[in-house]
């Protein structure tokens, strides 16, 4: 193997991560807190590639919940923030704001903090149900927890459905 051999495929970093989800409530009313921490290990590929393919790291924190407003109405929501560094070798940011994350995440000049979320209001009046949905993902929202995700959009949706046969 020669790192200069262009016929060799681009390598991939060994990526590790951990996370948890903890919640409280019932199936009708609940709230969950979740966290994901993932990072690439720079030493897992040949040094030749380090400035061509940067190692990344990410932390995601989110809240997800459901509230049964009344018998036919339910509200569900999911909101998450992602702090994503595209280069773990970039210089660390030294400021009062970033000190709050010391020991949790190294904020670098290659780091971005973005938000994503959705809210759904559903009404179930048998045999008809309806839903109003709003989704938002900020530009450049990224997470190492998903292989692909569209970003930079807002969407509003309305849907209705019914049963034809029992």
Name each model-derived stretch.
Residues 1-166:
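Signature for the C-terminal beta-barrel architecture of outer-membrane proteins
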């Amino acid at each position: 193997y020669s790192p200069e051999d262009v016929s060799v495929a681009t390598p991939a970093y060994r990526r590790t991560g951990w996370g948890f989800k903890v919640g409280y409530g019932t199936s009708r009313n609940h709230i969950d807190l979740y966290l994901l921490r993932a990072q690439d290990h720079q030493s897992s590929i040949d040094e030749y590639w380090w400035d061509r393919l940067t190692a990344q790291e990410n932390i995601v924190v989110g809240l997800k919940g459901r509230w049964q407003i009344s018998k036919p109405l339910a509200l569900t929501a999911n909101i998450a923030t992602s702090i994503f560094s595209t280069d773990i070798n970039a210089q660390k940011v030294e400021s009062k704001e970033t000190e709050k994350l010391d020991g949790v995440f190294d904020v670098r000049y290659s780091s971005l903090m973005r938000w994503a979320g959705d809210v759904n209001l559903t009404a179930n009046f048998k045999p008809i149900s309806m839903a109003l949905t709003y989704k938002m993902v900020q530009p450049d929202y990224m997470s190492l927890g998903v292989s692909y995700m569209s970003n930079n959009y807002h969407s509003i949706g309305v849907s209705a459905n019914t049963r034809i046969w029992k």
